[in-house]
Amino acid sequence: MFSGSNSYLGGNTGRQPPQQPQQQYGGFQPNQGFQPQQTGFQPQQTGFQPQPTGYGNAAPLQPNFTGYPLQPQPTGYSQPSQAGFPGGQQQQQQFNNAPQQQNFQTGAPPIPQIPQQFQQPQQTQQAQPPPAPPVQQPQATGFAAMADSFKPAAAEPSKPRGRRASKGGAKIPSIRLSFITAQDQAKFETLFKSAVGDGQTLSGEKSRDLLLRSKLDGNSLSQIWTLADTTRSGQLHFPEFALAMYLCNLKLVGKQLPSVLPDVIKNEVSSMVDIINFAIDDDAPAATNAPSFDGRQNTATPPTIQQPQPMASNSALLTAQMTGYPGQQNNFSGGFQPQQTGFQGQMQTGFSGQQGGLQPQPTGYNQMSNPQATGYNGPRPPMPPMPSNFSSHLSPAQTGMQGGMIAPLNSQPTGVDGQWGLVNAPAPNIDLLHSRMMPQQGREQGNFTTAGITGNAEIPWGITKDEKTRYDSVFKAWDGFGKGYISGDVAIEVFGQSGLPKPDLERVWTLADHGNKGKLNMDEFAVAMHLIYRKLNGYPLPAQLPPALIPPSTRNFNDSIGAVKSLLHQESNFRKNSGATLLPQKTGVSYLKNHSFRGDATPGRTGRKDATVYKNNDDDVGYKSSARRRLGASSPRPSSPGSTTSNDDLSLDQLRKKIAERQVILDAIDFKAENAADEDDALDRKDRREAEDLYHRIRRIQEDIDAHPDASLRNVDSGAERRALKRQLQTLTDKLPDIASRVRRTERSIADAKLELFRLKDAKAHPGSASSIVGTGPGGAITESDRLKARAKAMMQQRSAALTGKKIEASNDDLDAPKRLEEENLKIRTEKENNERMVQDVEESVRDFSRGLEDSLKDGGESSSSEHEKRRWEDGLGVEDEVKDFIFDLQRSSRSARVRTDDRSRETPRTEASHASPAPAARSETPSSQPSSTPTPAGGSYSQYKTPEDRAAYIKQQAEKRMAERLAALGIKAPSKSGETTQQRLEREKNERAAKLRQAEEEDAKREAERQARIAEEQGAPPPAPEQPKETAKKPPPPPSRKAARSDASERKAEEERIINEQKAQIIATNELEDDAQRQEAELAKEREAAQARVKALEDQMKAGKLKKEEEKKKRKALQAETKQQEARLAAQRAEIEAAQARERELQRQLEAIDDSDSSDDDEGPEQVTPQASTPTQGSQELERKEPSPPPPPPSIPVVVSPVPAIATTTSLPSPTPQVTSPVVSPPVDTETRNPFLKKMAQSGDASTASTASNNPFHRLPAQELSTPAPIQVQPTGNRPSRVRPEEDDWDVVGSDKEDDSSDDEGPGAGGARHLASILFGTMAPPRPLSSMGNEATSAPESPAVASPPAATPPPPPVPNFNAPPPPPMPSAGAPGGPPPPPPPPPGMGAPPPPPMPPMGGAPAPPAGVRPAGLLGEIQMGRSLKKTQTKDKSSAAVAGRVLD
């Protein structure tokens, strides 16, 4: 709101003519010191023509009352004039209700009296702040009536013109404000329209009345007004009014008002205010007494002037000025300064960059200080400048002083065609369009509409800088690969999001794709987006692209191409016309006038050669080729330092001399070449030797790696293993908070239970004390309400006692009970806090440990260089063919060794279990099994620690130990312990190194034994004899320790039981962690196997196309054929010695029968004195398949039979527990077997199921079975009758594991699917008699031995010499009374029954339904049974059968 108003000019002619206010744009400082100027001798017939009051970019101006408030009068003439530059916006002041002023005879309009506030002497040079004017009406600022301004005034206003017709009332754009909701905005619009009426702004008084309804205090309303009035005009546009309502709501809900508006809200409000001001239509001017200039009027069609855009939103209003007095302006930046009118030489308004104030100019004669009469008949006032032409550019006209200093001006784009990216008009809905056109999900459906992005804003042809920035961001978002263009298919998707119909999008593409390239660059994409933007705001698409939208790149590119074409055309014509087409290479003369295509004929540049002339200058180079000059001897050879004359001038002697010299040189060259060749050969031989040596060393290292105990770990993908370990570590770490919370809950429960127990005990000890009060407070505390209840209860008891006559003993302990309870509560709380600190310490230590593990896993990650080296030296990528073949050969040998290791590892668990099965006494003497069975002496047991701190430290120590062991097994170094001293760490590392050294020595010994056995097998001879003492010396230590262990067996047993009982708490605490770790290890093993399978498949694929593979296949086939032939020869040899071994077998059976009868009543478990290393044979019935293990602690009497000439046997008796074992018989000392059944079974083993596989082509040879007594292996690696020895081991080990400590029978460890099946199906049916086997005979059948044994057994009948099926498996320990079902016998084989097993003295009585022992005795005596013809071989080897 303006603080002052201008007065109307009065009716006396002695006063100054009116002064039109003129805006001085861009400044806030008032121009002081303007003196009233004289009007000169101008005839004032029709008044003064109004002059331009602003610049082309001026914001819309508001009307100002410049006279008395009660009778508004026009200050000049409402016909605006042309400012003289394109895009200039004229200001117009009109009042439809202004009455016509009378024309006096003087020709000048009557001047009203000067208001009181302006009656000052004219000599006053100081500016006065004008008072506040009355309510002002909005001023139209369009260009519709610009051309009509030069015509005679009409009697009534013309109708509005422009793109949209004028409507009554406030014009509010359809733009959503983001800081209020749509419903609130609709309500505010209704309220604003009802309050503003036909105007566009809400005055300060009305705004005050509306804001006072909010009941807010004056300070808040003042702050709200300051924030809302963004234009500082004293009036509110609709967005400002909505902002004021929004701020009032913030204050009403209790929020603080912001000191400064946020940029988003401020920009939205300012932009909408500018749009409202620019959208105001121009109305027709009111009738005035302006003179008619018909004679000088330009009748041509006025040009179409581009709508200018505002530079700032706060320069929208005029500053009211006194028209007749200088200095009547305020400090508002958008105000106009008073300017004298009527002088021809006015200032030019179409340029920028000048500074300084406007100097008032006289309108008549210069320096006239006295007012002049208005009736002077001189020249008329100058007509306002008209446009000089109506082309695309308008000529500026002079409107002020030539060369005068003006206020700083900002250069504004005029909107003329060809201007690119310089328009600064507000861009409504551009944010919505930008967000719509960006890549978004769901765009594949294509269901886009124009809802939400359409509008009716006025948009110029030119693209604004803000729009160009947004279009470029959309382009870059879709051009993900940075190609610099967008193809047609992408453009369909982008432009389709606008919702425009397909024909419009086709026209947009046609207009934007300059040159029909099928793709759009960044500028062309901006053009297309701008066309879409205009179309969404109601503008039609043009038929052709206007010059304003032609991208500079396209325009400049076409111009540059045209310039180059023109240059080439001109140069070609010049050469053709001037004869310059002659070859300058021959003439050496350039026929061009200039040495440059640019036509720069500078005399100083004539010596410089360029592309116009080319002539090679041989002097500029250091080498000259004379070969081309020697052809035909047309020119002499150029001189050289070594030859001054030609060969023709030399004499014969000279020529001979030169030939001899050349011959000497050639001989020297040949000699040097021979020496070099010899040296190269020597170097090649040396390199070959070194390479062979390296190959050999690499092979040895690879063999050592394959034979290492941790060789299986290196085949695992380290990355996958590391990720699996990280996942396992994360899983365990995630469980820590839950475990800690459960511990804390348990501690709280314990504390509550202890407190409750104390209350009960205290109440029992002091029946009448106050401790009987039950506390209901937190933690069982007694509250005041509990005491009141107790007192009321006591009073009731006293009253009831008084009524009944009973006596109530008064308690004196009322004060002591709370004290005792408080002491106990404090004690319990202290203990609870101590436990909580311990739990926190454990949590922190576990977290530190997990962080250390995670860091170690991260540090061991593979880099790109290591990955490259791995692919090069393991996959053979990027190396020579010879090296690649060597790598593949190493991999093949490594896989073979790994398969052999896997075969041995399958038997290792059972062997270790056989060592771990004896009593604790024997276990304590075994170094290998001692760590797993007895606790570490340094660690102690869980029960040894009495305090919670010690127990927590013990649990932590054990957990760290187990984790370190697992990490060591995986090949990861465990992080150092924070609480471990240097001495302890050195001691621990020393022990670890010693253990690893012992293990490595044992593994080396095993590998050496296997290698010797393998060599012996390949040579077809039995193993060397010196190995037997070695193995014997290796195995026997357990038996000698038997007596020493038996001496303190009871003590160790008691200690073991006590330790087991004490470790229950620790087992409970760590059981869950170990189960999870085992599960993770199982998953890791599966992943490792999968990775190995993938690697193996990849290797097989790489080798598939190799020629060497075919050669290897041929060699393998030949080797297999040779193996089969050798097996055939060995089978024939075995058949020849079968007869010689029959007698040996009979003597062996008799000896076993005698041994069994002698030891039938002994309770001692099976014992084997002779080590397994001396019993390598496996085919006979009498051989025991298990490793020697420490004897049990109970006293046992082993029956050692004196050796016969060919056999030394040791029979072990079964224990009284229901365990079925078989006797053990040692073979001859010389380890050479002559058992024909062993060889028969080796031949028939092809039809049986092999427990392990082997890659050895000689696996069927008996020599291998004879010479592979691995120290920890139970079975040889070759094929053999697989249903004899594993099942015997299974029976023994299960029995020894499952029975009590009193039954300490030996037996190797067993496991696997067959063992489990024998346990499951061994007891499902009653025992089957041996008659189901038919009349077959087997070389080594295992008798079930479940019937009551006789005192002695007769010698077995002779056994026919033919191949027989393998024996049935031994029953498991879980089924003591039932024998396993026999395997299906082959058809057509009738033979006496097999010899029986020695009787088991301690076997229990058979269960009900079992056949009597007499039948078994008859069968053992040789009774013939019915022949069977069963041919079904599909059942499993250990499948059960249902008997009738």
UniProtKB/Swiss-Prot annotation:
What is the recorded name of this protein? Actin cytoskeleton-regulatory complex protein pan1
Q: What gene makes this protein?
A: pan1
What does the similarity note say? Belongs to the PAN1 family.
Instruction: State the source organism's domain of life.
Output: Eukaryota
Q: Which residues form a coiled coil?
A: 685-763, 980-1157
Question: What Gene Ontology cellular-component terms does the record carry?
Answer: actin cortical patch; endosome membrane; plasma membrane
Per UniProt, residues of the EF-hand domain are 216-251, 500-535
Cite the EH domain residue spans from the record. Answer: 184-272, 467-556
| Compartments (UniProt record) | Cell membrane; Endosome membrane; Cytoplasm, Cytoskeleton, Actin patch
Chain's role = Component of the PAN1 actin cytoskeleton-regulatory complex required for the internalization of endosomes during actin-coupled endocytosis. The complex links the site of endocytosis to the cell membrane-associated actin cytoskeleton. Mediates uptake of external molecules and vacuolar degradation of plasma membrane proteins. Plays a role in the proper organization of the cell membrane-associated actin cytoskeleton and promotes its destabilization.
Topology within the bilayer: Peripheral membrane protein
Could you tell me where the Pro residues compositional bias lies?
1351-1409
The ranges of region (Disordered) come to 1-140, 289-309, 594-651, 797-1444
